[in-house]
């Protein structure tokens, strides 16, 4: 883990450094995995869902920015829970839920990696066992990588952020020249169920903005820089997502979208950039998903280390097993693999979206409770809280009306986090 005291004598981070962290965290594997899923629900109106998702992220980013500016640390959301909600059962349950949310996100991204790998290496095939094989394989490889080295994660991400952005910008520029307005005109508004389902999924593509808060302790003037960084990073990402959605719906037919929803970005590249462009985008997607799994595993392991040092996990979880890995790391990885095998990409996206929304709603509660200390605007926080509540209720209702089994996993995640927290407190584990 990084030592944050005195910033290790390194030059403090400026505005564009923090913005780069935010864009890199948001514009990652999520867009490769989620764009097709969102387009299946909203079709020509997909860009509207990404725009609304960006607005929700802006409100949430405001709460995050004020907390990060006032309480700079590398603990991020876990530290916010402790400060605003104390060290009781509720705070611990939210920390466990956030940890579980990251685990579900890894499973989702692994599924996307498997889909792109099969599309690239077994053209025309959509065999489930092949997708699962590649998905489980990349989780195992990245777990091993994290067990051997901590230092390579950051450097790898910097390189891959540049590659991802260049590939996506190339796709957008090519798409603008061949944009077909008739394909992206909204003839009828989507149903409320489709709208809220899509908002929940698109918000997941923005969820990485929280990573900027983890860098607050390395910023020269966090009170000034953090709010600006959140605004710029989320704004740029929103424009990028809207552009990608317009390009996708303009050049990929509904039939292709239904068949290749998990690899929609690559399908959009084929008519725009030819076979070479298609190969470049697929390789970019594989690199993006692999690096996202790597970075998220790194985050999960560090959060577990942080929670262990605060005595918020059983001692066994932090007991060393091999190199830098612990028993807790292995238990979480096994859980991730089980979820990868049990749920498809769409269901995993729904579970991760719902639990992310709930965790970020809790950040609003923390910000409201600490509003005087963090110099936050109460009206903005209240509006943001109400918007987040509306999205959560609408998203859950849409899943219920569809009879989605993801709802069972969402409820199970909430109950599991709460029960484990209660048991740990009762047994004085923490």
Curated annotation (Swiss-Prot):
It is found in: Cell inner membrane. It comes from the Bacteria. The keyword Cell membrane applies. One of its GO terms (molecular function) is transmembrane transporter activity. Residues 1-14, 60-88, 150-157, 214-228, 294-325, 369-379, 425-430 are cytoplasmic. It is a multi-pass membrane protein. The chain crosses the membrane at residues 15-35, 39-59, 89-109, 129-149, 158-178, 193-213, 229-249, 273-293, 326-346, 348-368, 380-400, 404-424. Residues 36-38, 110-128, 179-192, 250-272, 347, 401-403 are periplasmic. GO terms for biological process: amino acid transport; response to pH; stress response to copper ion. Keywords: Amino-acid transport, Cell inner membrane, Cell membrane, Membrane, Transmembrane, Transmembrane helix, Transport. Belongs to the amino acid-polyamine-organocation (APC) superfamily. PANTHER family: AMINO ACID TRANSPORTER-RELATED, INNER MEMBRANE TRANSPORT PROTEIN YBAT. This is Inner membrane transport protein YbaT. It comes from Escherichia coli (strain K12).
